[in-house]
Amino acid sequence: MAGGKRGGKVAPTKTFGRDYERSKGKISRDRVYDEEDIIKRNQESDSDDNSGSESGSENETKNNNNKSKLGSDSSDDEPVIVSRNPNAKKPAAKRPPTTKKQQESDSEDDSDKESDSEDEIANPNRMKQVTKKLSEINVNAKVELSRREKEELARQAATQRQNEKQQKSDLERLQVIRKQREEAAKRKEEEKKANEEKMAERRRLGLA
């Protein structure tokens, strides 16, 4: 048969490059290992794990040492103070910003205080009286009275004089009344005596 396929086995073709490496990897994966190969592989993996764990433990110990050093340094540099006093003062709260109205009211209060102090200086009567000890008071010193005190004393003296005059006039009037009563009593007695004498004369004349 001309032009037909050839019967029988096909000759293997050679592979190069990437195809060769892939085919080689497949062959190595499909390979069956003996017991000795398995034991060697296990020993190698155990040694790798041990070395990894030792390196990990060394790294952990180093990290812990570094942390402890950092903690000791921070504790030495910045000591933490815990106050157990319940009455400890708290930090003062921030004051709110003052507005224009508050500033104006504060300025008005200051001006009022200044005016009050000026009035006290100008008017000595408004000054606060200073308490003095008995030993500091001079009894013999003349006391200067104010105008109001002088007016009050003059008014009291005038009322006292008026009362004295009224009492005098009352006494004089009482004396006059007493004299009038005494004179009236004398007249009554005289009239009574005169009447009695007349009655006595009539009796004598009648009997005669």
From Swiss-Prot:
Q: Which family does it belong to?
A: Belongs to the PDAP1 family.
Name the UniProt record assigns to this protein: 28 kDa heat- and acid-stable phosphoprotein homolog
Taxonomy, superkingdom: Eukaryota
Task: Write the signal peptide boundaries.
Answer: none
Q: Where is the composition biased (Acidic residues)?
A: 105-121
Task: Enumerate the residue ranges of region (Disordered).
Answer: 1-133, 145-208
* UniProt-listed PANTHER family: 28 KDA HEAT- AND ACID-STABLE PHOSPHOPROTEIN PDGF-ASSOCIATED PROTEIN (PTHR22055)
Listed GO CC annotations: cytosol
What UniProt keywords are attached to this protein's entry?
A: Coiled coil
* Intrachain disulfide bonds: none
Specify residue ranges for compositional bias: Basic and acidic residues.
16-44, 145-154, 162-208
**Compositionally biased, Low complexity: which spans?**
52-69, 84-100
